[in-house]
Amino acid sequence: FHRDGSVREHLHRLAAEAVAAVADGAELLVLSDQAAGPDERVCDPHLAVAAVDKALREARRDDGSSRRRDVSLVLQAAGIRNVHDVMVALGFGAQALCPYAMMEKAMDGSPEPSTAADNVLSGLQKGMEKVLSTLGIHELRGYGRLVSAIGVTPE
């Protein structure tokens, strides 16, 4: 978002755009920071996905049901750097992730880039499985109810 705007304004605008896109029939939304220019600031990816998820849960169809079920959220962000970031993003509402900076870093200079990428994905998968099994959760959906923010206003 532009340097002159606030994080709050950006999140409200992003959420409104997402709700409008879903109302117009979008079934997949990709929240990405990859195209951010030099005059822009990058919003924390977890804040972005949480704001969009919340707005879609609150948005209603004509029959009164939530618009959140109409769309899948993909988070493409450089800020996804480890298993914790992955789990928080999934807990906040992302259905799929593209940790492009992590993948680029792993493959950069590697003699076998595809092996490096496979190793990153394998490590993330094992880490996710460990987190879920430690918490006694059998489905990824169950993780979301355990994620909360401390010290952040309800808004």
Positions of the model-derived regions?
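Hydrophobic faces of well-ordered beta-strands that scaffold small-molecule active sites
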Residues: 29, 71-77, 90, 97-99
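Alpha-helix-loop-beta-strand connector modules within alpha/beta enzyme cores
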Residues: 41-73, 122-130
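Short, ordered loop/turn segments at secondary-structure junctions
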Residues: 34-36, 78, 94, 101-104
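Structured alpha-helical segments in the cores of large, soluble enzyme domains
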Residues: 10-29, 48-60, 128
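Flexible, glycine-rich loop/tail regions that form catalytic "lids" or insertion modules at the edges
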Residues: 1-4, 17, 21, 25-26, ...
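Active-site mouth loops of central-metabolism enzymes
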Residues: 1-15, 72-81
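Catalytic cores of alpha/beta
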Residues: 80-93
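Conserved, mostly hydrophobic/aromatic
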Residues: 33, 89, 139
